[in-house]
């Protein structure tokens, strides 16, 4: 195969696809570029399915090479190691729109690798990475119902921006990524600043319209390359087995899905499944294997639940389609934390804890596009331990899902946080999912808002989140508010919306089918807003403004000193500032502009540090009396240390009212005496003792 290239314009950027020059032994390989950013995408698939395979083993890994930006990796080994959070999030972003486009029944292993090999400091590689994956899969021959397109949308001054640069995003009220086919939107990921439902929906439609040029050109690129499709056919449906399961076990499955408690329901469904396997598996006579019976049992299970929803029957837990599960909201549940909340929605529960730290405890972030490390003063960590779903599992390693859900929660909260200037703390929020039956990330957003207010963080407005679902068959569809885990698994859409009473902060949408219309999205957004306002109303009954009387809240302040006093505060070899920290047990930092940050968990410690900093950095006041120590005696007087690093001269004539012939007759080094400041002359301090003595 020779070298093939295809270039096209998308917005203000030129995108180029190339294949046949690099990575020629991969089943599909595309070098995609936009401006100076270049990404190599490779796809390799297995021609055979592993025996007994019952899921689609697709792996997607996005990798940023530091050489792409002219950097050498930090650390001892000086090579790229474990994936960064950005790499993990982008891997998930790419996986989500392509996974639904592999045909049902295709379970051959597929590996997609995306490697950033040249990086422009203004272009996020994620959009062209998705376009490159779309092209590489389409020319690989692997069964894939693409191509897809993708676009980023910004919004500022009432206008949308297509594929904005990093600089343009700084002033944007929206950062949205949308991906889909020529006819369907498959994935949306967005962060916003309290925008209306209409602005968000119009942005999704705008992106879908704009990436059509990419889909058209990728299709032309595929034709240009010439692709030989794999000889693969979807396995035929065993209609007899499917019919037998429906007739023998359909009613039992239907009754089992009326059990409201998740664990009890799963136990009952498991018992019915075991009975079906015992009744229908007979590999010697009819060839029905355990795996085959399990597969068709799952199909009947899915169709049973979906049909009930479409018929507007009561949902699994007895609710109608627009009702939010019962809420239980508590704050201040942990005695010694800075802020805490326990948010329970049905069988989903999040224990969310806020910790306030000093600015020096910020997370240092190294970005490919930036030459300098950046401080992140807001940390949000989401933990999903196995016990929350009644399972045994490995602990210790942060999973991709936890990173992805944590980022979604962060997006929901970030727009309402005060700036570091308004609130000079590093803020860490941890969400521990203690129970899960759907929508744990949205419970985390509600819990985070409550926990932050309990800690006294002056957030701009309370934030709540809700997960919506969809079941669609032909022209029939039903939108569900506050979906359960089973409704998420058996449905066609996962649509998460978070925001305040004023607007949307975050939206995440994953759609498993084609044919989602603007009407469906409008209804989903309308129901989500109603549910969000309902939840916010109940949250506000518990806590509606920051708790300013929290005894556990650390104390912090920033004081400004003259830049020529920085040296005095630090002292020789850091001696002075280290002494303040050691004596007060507080954290003290000073920057080059003279901003001194003092932080302590204890009021007494904070006050001590504050006074010591002021003693070192403030100029003595004329007429004020100080208690000082004699540090040196000379013929013409004595030098008295009245403040840290500040000595004044007590002239021999100012020691006593009577004539002093010899200083040593009145003072000796180490004596503590009271003195009054007479004058300040170009940094020289003149003192008097005799004015404080009676004649």
Curated annotation (Swiss-Prot):
Keyword Cell membrane: no
Signal peptide: none
Annotated localization: Cytoplasm
Disulfide bonds: none
Reaction(s) the record says it catalyses: RNA(n+1) + phosphate = RNA(n) + a ribonucleoside 5'-diphosphate
An example molecular function term from Gene Ontology annotations: magnesium ion binding
Family to which the UniProt record says this protein belongs: Belongs to the polyribonucleotide nucleotidyltransferase family.
Gene Ontology cellular-component annotations: cytosol
Pfam family, one: PNPase
NCBIfam families: polynuc_phos, PRK11824.1
Quaternary structure and interacting proteins, as annotated: Component of the RNA degradosome, which is a multiprotein complex involved in RNA processing and mRNA degradation.
PANTHER family on file: POLYRIBONUCLEOTIDE NUCLEOTIDYLTRANSFERASE, POLYRIBONUCLEOTIDE NUCLEOTIDYLTRANSFERASE 1, MITOCHONDRIAL
Sections of the chain in a coiled coil: none
Residue ranges annotated for the S1 motif domain, each copy included: 623-690
Name of the protein: Polyribonucleotide nucleotidyltransferase
Taxonomy of the source species: Bacteria, Pseudomonadati, Pseudomonadota, Gammaproteobacteria, Candidatus Pseudothioglobaceae
Principal localisation: cytoplasm
Listed HAMAP family: PNPase (MF_01595)
SUPFAM superfamilies attached to this UniProt entry: Eukaryotic type KH-domain (KH-domain type I) (SSF54791), Nucleic acid-binding proteins (SSF50249), Ribonuclease PH domain 2-like (SSF55666), Ribosomal protein S5 domain 2-like (SSF54211)
Positions bound to Mg(2+): 488, 494
BP GO annotations: mRNA catabolic process; RNA processing
Organism: Ruthia magnifica subsp. Calyptogena magnifica
CDD domains: KH-I_PNPase (cd02393), RNase_PH_PNPase_1 (cd11363), RNase_PH_PNPase_2 (cd11364), S1_PNPase (cd04472)
Stated role: Involved in mRNA degradation. Catalyzes the phosphorolysis of single-stranded polyribonucleotides processively in the 3'- to 5'-direction.
């Amino acid at each position: 195969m020779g070298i093939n290239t295809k270039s096209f314009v998308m917005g203000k950027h030129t995108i180029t696809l190339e294949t046949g020059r690099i990575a020629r032994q991969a089943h599909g390989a595309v070098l995609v570029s936009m401006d100076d950013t270049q990404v190599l995408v490779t796809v390799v698939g297995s021609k055979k399915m592993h025996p007994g395979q019952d899921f689609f083993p697709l792996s997607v890994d996005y990798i940023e090479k530091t050489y792409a930006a002219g950097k050498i990796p930090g650390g001892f080994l000086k090579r790229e190691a474990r994936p960064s959070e950005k790499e993990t999030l982008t891997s998930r972003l790419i996986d989500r729109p392509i996974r639904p486009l592999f045909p049902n029944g295709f379970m051959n292993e597929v590996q997609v690798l995306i490697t950033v090999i040249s990086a422009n400091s203004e272009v996020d590689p994620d959009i062209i990475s998705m376009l490159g994956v779309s092209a590489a899969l389409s020319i690989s021959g692997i069964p894939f119902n693409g191509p897809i397109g993708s676009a980023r949308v910004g919004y500022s001054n009432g206008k949308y921006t297509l594929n904005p640069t990093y600089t343009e995003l700084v002033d944007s009220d929206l950062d949205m990524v949308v991906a889909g086919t020529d006819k369907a939107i498959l994935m949306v990921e967005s962060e916003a600043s309290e925008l209306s439902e209409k602005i968000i929906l119009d942005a999704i439609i705008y992106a879908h319209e704009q990436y059509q040029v990419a889909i058209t050109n990728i299709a032309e690129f595929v034709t240009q390359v010439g692709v030989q499709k794999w000889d693969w056919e979807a396995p035929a449906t065993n209609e007899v087995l499917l019919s037998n399961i429906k007739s023998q076990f359909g009613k039992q499955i239907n009754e089992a899905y009326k059990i409201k408690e998740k664990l009890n329901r799963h136990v009952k469904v498991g018992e019915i499944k075991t009975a079906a396997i015992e009744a229908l598996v007979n590999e010697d006579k009819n060839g029905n294997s355990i795996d085959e019976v399990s597969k068709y049992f799952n199909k009947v299970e899915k169709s049973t639940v979906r049909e009930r929803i479409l018929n507007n029957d009561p949902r699994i837990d007895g609710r109608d389609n627009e009702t939010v599960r019962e809420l239980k909201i508590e704050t201040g549940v942990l005695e010694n934390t800075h802020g805490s909340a326990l948010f329970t929605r049905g069988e989903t529960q999040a224990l969310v804890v806020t910790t306030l730290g000093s600015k020096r405890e910020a997370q240092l972030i190294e970005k490919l596009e930036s030459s300098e490390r950046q401080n992140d003063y807001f940390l949000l960590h989401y933990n999903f331990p196995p016990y929350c779903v009644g399972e045994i599992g490995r602990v210790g390693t942060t999973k991709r899902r936890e990173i992805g859900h944590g980022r979604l929660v962060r997006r929901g909260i970030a727009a309402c946080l005060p700036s570091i200037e308004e609130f000079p703390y590093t803020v860490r929020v941890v969400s521990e999912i203690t129970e899960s039956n759907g929508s744990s990330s949205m419970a985390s957003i509600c819990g985070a808002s409550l926990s932050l207010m309990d800690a006294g963080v002056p957030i701009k407005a309370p934030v709540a989140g809700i997960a919506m679902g969809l079941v669609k068959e032909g022209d029939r569809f039903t939108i569900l508010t506050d979906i359960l885990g089973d409704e998420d698994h058996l449905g066609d859409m996962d649509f998460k919306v978070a925001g305040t009473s004023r607007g949307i902060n975050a939206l995440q949408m994953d759609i498993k089918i084609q044919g989602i219309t603007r009407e469906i999205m409008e209804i989903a957004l309308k129901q989500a807003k109603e549910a969000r306002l309902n939840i916010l109303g109940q949250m506000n009954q518990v806590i509606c403004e920051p708790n300013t009387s929290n005894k556990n809240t650390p104390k912090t302040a920033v004081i400004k000193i003259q830049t020529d006093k920085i040296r005095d505060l630090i002292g020789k070899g850091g001696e002075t500032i280290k002494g303040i920290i050691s004596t007060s047990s507080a954290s003290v930092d000073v920057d080059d502009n003279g901003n001194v940050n003092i932080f302590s968990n204890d009021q007494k410690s904070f006050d001590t540090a504050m006074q010591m900093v002021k003693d070192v950095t403030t100029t003595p006041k004329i007429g004020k009396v100080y208690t000082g120590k004699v540090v040196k005696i000379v013929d013409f007087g004595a030098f008295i240390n009245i403040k840290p690093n500040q000595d004044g001269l007590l002239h021999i004539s100012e020691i006593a009212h009577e004539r002093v012939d010899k200083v040593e007759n009145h003072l000796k080094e180490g004596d503590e005496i009271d003195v009054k400041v007479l004058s300040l002359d170009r940094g020289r301090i003149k003192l008097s003792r005799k004015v404080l003595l009676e004649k």
